C-alpha cells in the first residue's frame, strides 16, 4: 500500500489529523492500494498534506473522479524557532518575523495548477501557529558536508482556515480594487506577497481560467480577470 502511515507521520500531520477528525470518521483507512488519512461518515476522503503535492498524484488520479476529496494543507501563519540539544532540552526560543497566509498554497499547487477545477476536490488551508524544533546548529551529512536541519513542525494552534472549493474561490483572492489590466508585480504588491509567489499564483489562476492574458506593458505581461468573486 502507498500513503502516509502512522509510524511515518510527523507531529504536525498527527495533530492535524486529530484536529480534523469528527465523530464517525475512520482514520488510516486502507482504500484499494492506498491509505486514506480520514474517511468521513458521508464518504468524503480527507488527506492531510504538510509538504508538496506531487506525492498525491497517483492517489488523485485513481480516486478523484469517483470520490469527493479534501486536501488539508497547513500554512505556518506564525512560528517559533526552538533550538534543542541532543537530549531534547530547550536551548533557545525566538519568534520568526515571517508571516504567511493562504497564498502560500500556490507554492505547492504549481504541481497541479488546474487541480481546483475538479468538482470533487476542495482544498482547506489551516493557518497555524507552529513551533519549529531544530538542532542547535548545522548538522553534517555522512560525507561530512554541513547541512541545514529542516527541523520538525509542531502544531500549537489553528488560528483560522481558508477553504478553496473551485475557481470562484480562487478568483476571490484577487483584491476587488485592483485596476485592470495588471502585471504580476502589481498583483503581488496588492496581495502582499513576494514576486515569485505572485508568479506562481498567476500561473495557477491562468490554468484555472481565472485570469487571461491581456498583452504587455513594456516587457511585463498583463492580466485581466475572467470572473468576479
What does each of the following model-derived ranges do?
Residues 1-35:
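Acidic-basic catalytic patches of nuclease active cores, encompassing PD-(D/E)XK
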